[in-house]
Each structure stands twice: as structure tokens, then as C-alpha cells.
Amino acid sequence: MLEEKNVKSRYVVRLFFSTLLVGGVSAAILGFIIRWSEFEPYFTDFDILKILSTLFWLFGVGLIFSVVSQMGFFAYLTVHRFGLGIFRSLWNGVQIVLILFVLFDVVYFRHRAFGGDLSPYIIDALVLTVVALVVSYIKAKQTNKEAFIPAIFFMVVVTVIEWVPAVRVNDDSWVHLMLFPLLICNAYQLLILHKLNQKSEQEKKPSK
């Protein structure tokens, strides 16, 4: 399962700021790639001022995405604890149903709301699924197999909830500019948490 032990405050602070950095850097890099058609003239004209101002703006946007990611992460840790308490052994089954519903929602209801070609919605759902499976597999290998389903749930369901503001706008550049940093931040937090827990537990042990 996902770790819910008490982590020393300095590790929580470290997680917060390191995730901020991950969000800022990923959005800055991916922003130029995703919106290259818009920013290409800055590079062809070698306009340093516009390049730097855009870089700082994208970095700031990434910080916001990172905060959204962290709110979702800690909210899920709470939801996960309640889910285990209420559903017990059925909790994994409940999560699987919700995962499938959300993936269906990402395709069907977006297409129903905005129309257009169905393939972009399917591709987004596939990206979510593949990233979630890879990250969850790594998480399970690093911790235990019981972490696999909760990790997929977090990477799919919680990411989609965090992603809703961009989805509602339905601008392709914003949809993907928000999605990828969220996935990166969520994956980072998921894969680093147990390491921080281990360090915190080691420090709590009395020295011999």
C-alpha cells in the first residue's frame, strides 16, 4: 500500500520544495516544446529578453501545477486511509472500478462535450494509462506488490481530477502543458515518498 507513516517535518519540506522544482523545470522545458509554433520566432530572432521572460513565465506556471499536484497527493493519502478503513479488502476493487470509469470519462464525456475527432481523447487516455502502469510497476518493485493498484489509482484518477481546469478550457496547448507536468510531479512524489519514510524511520531508531 501507499506509505502513510509520520515523516519528519524537514523531509516534508524537502518534498515540497523538490516537487516545486520538478514542476517548474518540467513545465519550462515542455512548454517550449508543446507551444513551439508560438515561441519559435523568439529563437529564430534570437530575442533573449522574450526567451527569458517566457522561460520564467512557464516556470511560474509549473510551480502552480506542482502545488496542485501536491494538494492532490496528500488528499489521496487521506482518502486511501479512509478507503482502507471503510472498504477493507474491497478497496482495491473499488479503485479498479473508479480507474476504469475515469479513463472512460476522459474519452467519452470529453468527446461528447467538445466533439471533434475521437483519436486525441483516446491518445490522452492511453498516455495516462501507460505512464500510470510504468510508474506503478516501479513503485511495486521498490516497495511491495500491494502498492500497485493504489499507485495506478493515484496516477490516473487523482491526475485527472487535478487536470480538470485545463480540460474544461479544451485548448490543446494548455491541456498538454498541464497534463505532463502533473504526471511528472505525481510520479516523482509517488516514487520518492517511501525513500523519505525510510530515512525518517532510520533517524527515529536510537543510536547504539
Task: Give the residues covered by each predicted segment.
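Alpha-helical transmembrane segments of multi-pass membrane proteins
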Residues: L21-F39, V160-V164
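Selected alpha-helical membrane-embedding segments in polytopic membrane proteins
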Residues: I29-R88
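Membrane-helix interface and helix-disruption motif detector
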Residues: W57-F59, H111-I122, A166-L177
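Alpha-helical transmembrane segments and their helix-start/interface "positive-inside/aromatic belt" motifs
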Residues: E4-V22, S173-V175
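Membrane-interface helix-boundary motifs at transmembrane edges
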Residues: H80-N92, K139-E146
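Terminal transmembrane helical module of multi-pass membrane proteins
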Residues: S136-K208
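Transmembrane alpha-helical segments of multi-pass membrane proteins
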Residues: Y76, R88-F104, A151-V157
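Membrane-proximal helix-loop-helix units in multi-pass membrane proteins
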Residues: I96-P150
